[in-house]
Structure formats: structure tokens, C-alpha cells
A protein has these predicted regions:
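Subtilisin-like serine protease catalytic core
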Residues: 213-344, 357-360
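Sec-dependent signal peptide recognition
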Residues: 3-9
Length: 361
């Protein structure tokens, strides 16, 4: 299962690959044309000062030696240890050259088998022309493919808002129904169980729902199932979510500031913020009110708000009130107005982290 997930990540990184993305180089030479075909997508809406490079397998030894040398001096690797590559890196004024996916000691063999260890992220001067940088690197024999670090955009810029205290009262018929769980707002979740109550929604139509009531008769969740929410951060302290959060026990019981479980990430208690490379956040906004919208928490609630606990709403797989809901792993790929939010690199790291740490969905 996880092997397939890792291969899927590799496929996603090369999903835009095509044979005619770019035309001949400026000199019209066939060598430039062949080199440009290593570039698998376009620079439209790409992160400035960033490229994802897939190196030839023969180059990895030198890259890893250069990384080890930098680590010994507690510095950041900026060169590959390969003359032809380093000439270009120097020209681009590269400030960091790191593996896209940090070493997870538990899964490194699987990672290497899938070829994911060959992906590196380059950071360089944001004033450098991305297309020119990609063209220069693509001409190097040790470079197999190049991908622009595309920025993904949220489909919705609104805010998740709490239920209004003055929400319309439900009809007597709706109030008199015996509901499967005692969460007070389940009655308003018409998309779960639609009784056709016009007081809940003017367009309510009985039976127009997801049939969750029948599903709950089979199961309301399973704590062995981990669901990764790749979104904004999840408010893991929320009273209707806290008990259903995935917990990285080795980090939780380990030493602060140390990667206790060897998965490549430090203090990832409930997941990780792949944008800021730090703690999960869910309420970061700027002075204009732009930033986190609460969507990650909203999504987590739809999946696994705790059922039958007498508060809030129900989750589709939130359990029956016996600590039997699925577990939510927060893989934060959108973070306020932070630079790098929602890029291909961030999304790829989030997906691989989920696979490496046991997420099923």
C-alpha cells in the first residue's frame, strides 16, 4: 500500500511531462532542444527562486557527500560536488540545495527504491529568470528532469464561521426525531441526514443526503484508520476534534527540538506545517485579515468530529462516542500568508509524510 503511495508521489511530480513542452533553444541547436525536453512543466504561476531537480542516479553519491560535508560544519549545502552542475549553481547564486524529501530512517530503503531520493529543491535569487535557470540546468548531463515549483491556489478565500446563535429554530417534527447520536447540531447537518425540514434549509428535500445513517449502522469509524488532511492546519485542541487527532507518540514523549522518531521532522506531534517547517497553525492572519480561513479544521470536522459527545456536530467517521473514530493527521500545506504556501514541493512533502507515517487516506 505505502509502496504504491510513494510511486504515486513520483508520478505526481512528473505528471506534466510531455514531449513538446518547449521549443528549440535560442541558438536553434538540437542539443538545446533535447535538453529543454527535460523540463516537465511551465513556469506559469511558479514560485520565484525555486526549482525542483531530478538528478541522474550516478550524481547522487556526490550530492550526498556534499550534503554530509555541509552538515558537519552545520552549514547549508549549496553545491553538488559535480563541476558541471556547480558551475550553474554558482551562476544562479544558489543559497540551498536540499533533498526534497528529508531522510526518514524508517523508510529510506523504500524511498530510494521509488527514486524519490533523487529529487532536490534548489533555492536561489528570486530575481533570476526561472526559464533561463531551468534551461541552463537542463543542459547538464547529470540533470534528468526539472520541474517548476508551481503555486497551487485555494479555490475559496472565505472564512469558516461558527454556527450563529440566532440560527432559525427547527420544526417540531425534526426536533422529535430520534437521532443516531446526541450531537446537538447533527439535526442541522442536512447533507448527512435530510428530513426535508425547510427551517434547516429552504431547499431541503427529504433523502437528498449522503446516506450516512445507513453507513453508521455498519461502522462509525475505526481508530486504526489515519486520515491525512492536506489543507490548512487543523486546530488539534478543538474540543470536538482533540480525541480523534493522530498523535506521534515518540515525538510527544520525546525531547523537544529533537527528531525522536527519525522521520526527518522535529516535534511533529499531530502532523507538521510543511510551509514554515514548524508547528501547525490555524489562525495566522495579516493586518488585512488575509491568511488562515479555518478550512483545515472544517475539513477535519467533516471527516472526524467526535460523535455522540453531546457537543457540536458529527463527523462522517467520528466514531460512536467510544473513542472509535478515525484519526486525523494534520499535513499543513497552506499556512496564512507565508511564502511558499501551497507549492508543489510543499504538497509533495505533505503527501509523502502522510504515507510514511501510516495514513490510509
Amino acid at each position: 500500500m505505502i509502496d504504491k503511495k510513494l510511486l504515486l508521489i513520483a508520478a505526481l511530480l512528473l505528471a506534466s511531462c510531455t514531449s513538446d513542452l518547449m521549443t528549440e533553444g535560442s541558438d536553434g541547436g538540437s542539443q538545446n532542444t533535447a535538453a529543454s525536453h527535460k523540463i516537465v512543466n511551465t513556469s506559469v504561476n511558479a514560485e520565484a527562486g525555486s526549482l525542483l531537480v531530478y538528478f541522474d542516479d550516478a550524481a547522487i553519491g556526490s550530492l550526498e557527500q556534499a550534503a554530509e560535508a555541509a552538515a558537519k560544519t552545520r552549514s547549508v549545502a549549496t553545491r553538488a560536488g559535480i563541476v558541471s552542475v556547480d558551475e550553474i549553481l554558482s551562476e544562479l547564486n544558489v543559497s540551498s540545495l536540499n533533498r526534497l524529501f528529508p531522510v526518514d530512517t524508517r523508510n529510506e530503503e523504500r524511498t530510494r527504491a521509488a527514486g524519490l531520493h533523487r529529487w532536490y529543491e534548489l533555492q536561489f535569487d528570486t530575481e533570476v529568470d526561472l526559464d533561463l535557470a531551468a534551461q541552463k540546468l537542463s543542459a547538464v548531463a547529470e540533470v534528468a528532469n526539472i520541474q517548476f515549483n508551481t503555486k497551487l491556489e485555494k479555490m475559496w478565500d472565505g472564512k469558516a464561521t461558527p454556527l450563529r446563535s440566532d440560527a432559525p429554530a427547527m420544526s417540531a417534527d425534526t426536533r422529535s426525531i430520534v437521532w443516531p447520536f446526541n450531537d446537538p447540531e447533527l439535526k442541522r447537518q442536512w447533507h448527512y441526514i435530510n428530513k426535508g425540514d425547510k427551517a434547516v434549509a429552504q431547499t431541503a428535500r427529504e433523502g437528498a443526503d449522503i446516506n450516512v445513517e445507513d453507513a453508521w449502522k455498519l461502522t462509525a469509524g475505526d481508530p486504526k484508520i489515519i486520515v491525512a488532511v492536506v489543507d490548512e492546519g487543523v486546530k488539534y485542541t478543538h474540543p470536538d476534534l482533540a480525541a480523534n487527532m493522530w498523535v506521534n507518540t515518540r515525538e510527544m514523549t520525546g525531547t523537544t527540538g529533537v527528531d525522536d522518531d527519525g522521520n526527518g521532522y522535529v516535534d511533529d506531534y499531530y502532523g507538521y506545517n510543511f510551509v514554515t517547517n514548524g508547528p501547525i497553525s490555524w489562525d495566522v492572519v495579516d493586518d488585512k485579515g488575509e491568511g488562515d480561513s479555518g478550512h483545515g479544521t472544517h475539513t477535519a470536522g467533516t471527516v472526524a468530529a467526535i460523535n455522540n459527545n453531546g457537543i457540536g456536530v458529527c463527523g462522517v467517521a467520528g466514531g460512536s462516542g467510544n473513542d472509535d473514530g478515525v484519526r486525523i493527521m494534520s499535513c499543513q500545506a497552506l499556512s496564512g500568508t507565508a511564502a511558499g504556501s501551497g507549492t508543489t514541493a510543499v504538497m509533495a512533502r505533505a503527501f509523502k509524510y502522510a504515507a510514511d507515517n501510516g495514513a490510509s487516506i
